[in-house]
Amino acid sequence: MLELIQHDSSYHLWAPSAQEKWYLITSLDDYSRYILYAQLLKKETSWAHIVALETMILTHGLPFSYYVDSHSIFRFVQGRDSFWRKHHTLTDESDPQWKQVLYDCNVKIIYALSPQAKGKIERPYQWLQDRIVRTCVRENVSDIRQAQTILNQEIRRYNFRQVHSTTQEVPYFRLQKALTEGTSLFREFKVRPPYQSVKDIFCLRLDRTVDSYRRVSFKSLVLKVNGVTQGDKVNIRIYPMNHLLSELRFWCNDRLVDVQRAKNRDLHLSIL
């Protein structure tokens, strides 16, 4: 059954001519071995992993569960992550942003408990490293966009043409057979009330209390909010629109009371 999505990132010198390592974020269906998402990035952030969730879920639907390691992006560990949480994150929630998205989607998270348990997802990385590095060397690739093009080509070849050594099937056809036979645990994604938009789900979150001037603040940024009174608890859903601007959706008592835009630099938000 299609019940588990293996999700991870790998930091590697994908294109030696670039003389810098990049992150590769992937999502892989455990049953069919079909690679659902693959993106090269210069920086690994919570938002990058949320974008991976959004892309995968809006394209393929909701899986039963995600399988990840204990990286701080996926799981808060008291002691290990306390300093990071207090000084370097957008919010002061102990539940990581990525985890909160899956909670809203009603998708279970399974954490790897040992290096051996991660063997499934590390095997595709070894294969990708071999293929992509060789191609990037042969074509003298030094730009991440060129490397992404090569990655996309390799993923298509793997998904649609390569017979997997374990399943003895091409991933795409194994995936389609399960969908046709109704043995898939993927569910259609729908925005659940009270939320109204995918921007309310695939986003960053921030909780604040309204002051006597009907404002909320974060560091140096002060925002006046419509539809609230002093003492109200506001949940701000932050949806980065691009590398400069984000949309802020203010929720209070399960109602969308205001929508504003703010500069990412004022939010101290880096998404690249």
Regions found by a protein language model. Give the residues of each.
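Mobile-element integrase/transposase regions
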Residues: 1-35, 42-53, 58-64, 99-104
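Acidic/histidine-rich, metal-coordinating catalytic segments
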Residues: 58-90, 113-115
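C-terminal, beta-rich DNA-binding module of retroviral/retroelements integrases
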Residues: 155, 159-272
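A structural microfeature
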Residues: 36-37, 258
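An acidic- and aromatic-residue-enriched active-site/binding cleft used to recognize and process polar
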Residues: 10, 30, 40-43, 69-71, ...
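The substrate-binding groove and active-site-proximal loops of carbohydrate-active enzymes
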Residues: 37-43, 84-88
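Charged alpha-helix within mobile-element recombinases
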Residues: 91, 97-190
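Short, conserved catalytic/metal-binding motifs centered on acidic residues
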Residues: 8, 33, 66-69, 118, ...
